[in-house]
């Protein structure tokens, strides 16, 4: 989940709650503990599952084609990139919206590309989907139009497609700065305060712990992940 989704809010439509059936758990270390011997025996199962998922990807409603009025460009995207595309282009261009990107639907992508003159992959950061499409023998554009650094935006999509960027609106007043800090009452604050006083070199981990690196605690020197 990308930051723009995780740190956002919007109006949603709710449906009736669906209770999945309870499934009994059976202990099976050979299945759930992937020590080398078990991992070798389970690897064929993983490959079989991926093949089944590849078939599922072709028909699942998670991956869908949305028609457009101008087939000169076909856009392939997923996640927030899809929302940027729809807000920037509306229903002008056909869109292949991928809700499942591994395994990717090969036949669906090829059929979509056959119906448009030019295929553009819109995705943030590395060109994962673009590389897959190129591997299928398609002439696609992606990172030649979009940066592999930072976030996308509606205007970034517009500029890449030769459209006029939308005008922005500046705030009349500056928003008060709110630097990241651990929440009041967080028990980690006391720990990091003590580590700071001891002047230790501390290797942290992902999550809220990273906030221990900023002032006034300044207690973490590195993180293992993220």
Predicted segments with their positions:
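Flexible, low-complexity linker and terminal segments
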Residues: 1-182, 187-191, 196-200
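Thiamine diphosphate
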Residues: 192, 201-226
């Amino acid at each position: 989940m990308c930051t723009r989704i995780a740190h956002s809010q919007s109006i949603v439509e709710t449906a009736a709650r669906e209770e999945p059936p309870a499934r009994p758990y059976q202990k099976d270390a050979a299945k759930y503990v992937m020590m080398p011997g078990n991992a070798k025996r389970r690897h064929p199962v993983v490959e079989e599952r991926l093949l089944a998922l590849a078939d599922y990807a072709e028909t699942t409603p998670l991956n869908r084609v949305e028609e457009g009025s101008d087939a000169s460009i076909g856009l392939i995207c997923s996640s927030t990139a899809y929302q940027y595309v729809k807000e920037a282009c509306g229903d002008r261009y056909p869109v292949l919206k991928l809700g499942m990107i591994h395994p990717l639907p090969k036949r669906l992508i090829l059929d979509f590309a056959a119906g448009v003159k030019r295929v553009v992959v819109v995705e943030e950061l590395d060109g994962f989907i673009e590389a897959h499409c190129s591997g299928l023998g398609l002439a696609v554009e992606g990172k030649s139009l979009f940066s592999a650094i930072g976030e996308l935006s509606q205007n970034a999509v517009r500029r890449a497609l030769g459209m006029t960027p939308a005008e922005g609106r500046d705030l009349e007043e500056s928003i008060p700065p709110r630097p990241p800090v651990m929440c009041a009452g967080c028990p980690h604050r006391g720990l990091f305060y003590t580590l700071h006083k001891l002047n230790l070199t501390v290797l942290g981990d992902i999550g809220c712990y990273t906030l221990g690196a900023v002032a006034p605690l300044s207690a973490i020197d590195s993180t293992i992940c993220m």
